[in-house]
Amino acid sequence: MKEIISVTILLILIMDPLGNLPIFMSILKHLEPQRRKKILIREMMIALLIMLLFLFAGEKILIFLNLRAETVSVSGGIILFLIAIKMIFPTYESKKKSGNIIKREEPFLVPLAIPLVAGPSLLATLMLLSHQYPKKILYLIGSLLIAWMITVVILLLSDIFLRLFGSKGVNALERLMGLILIMLSTQMFLDGIKSWFYI
């Protein structure tokens, strides 16, 4: 049970629904509310299929590449640490890229499903998890589905969240999520180091 909760929290933090709220709203704001919901659900379904594919194929990919679990754990911890740093200290360039991603036409696959939800960092994490817990794939699927559903709900209720917290409140929550992700990534890194040196 603890593993499901920790993996679910990790996946939610990487999906970063609060950080993606303003981008999703900007991309879909020119559409009718009903059409907006349909597109959002469609894109989230596509993202889920892609994430499940990487979760199931991740173990086989890592075996094919002949990577040890310790190596994947250390490198995964470093990647997640860098993501968390960007969440806490967003740079001007990252904000500029977020602004450039906004388009007026109706989105399909890119940029909502990929890379905003099913981004490279999340897909790499799913591969890592499937490699670390090959016998607990059902637990991983459950964690992924819970994280995905929470993300869907937050994005569907984007208007309410932005009215409730405001842009500054959402930014503060995202920084808090980044702080939690730093702790999780550090633990992942240390676990990999301990396993490598048989501590």
Swiss-Prot record:
InterPro entries: Multi_antbiot-R_MarC. It is found in: Cell membrane. Keywords: Cell membrane, Membrane, Transmembrane, Transmembrane helix. The chain crosses the membrane at residues 7-29, 39-58, 71-93, 108-130, 137-156, 176-198. It is a multi-pass membrane protein. It comes from the Bacteria. The keyword Nucleus does not apply. GO terms for cellular component: plasma membrane. Belongs to the UPF0056 (MarC) family. This is UPF0056 membrane protein bbp_399.
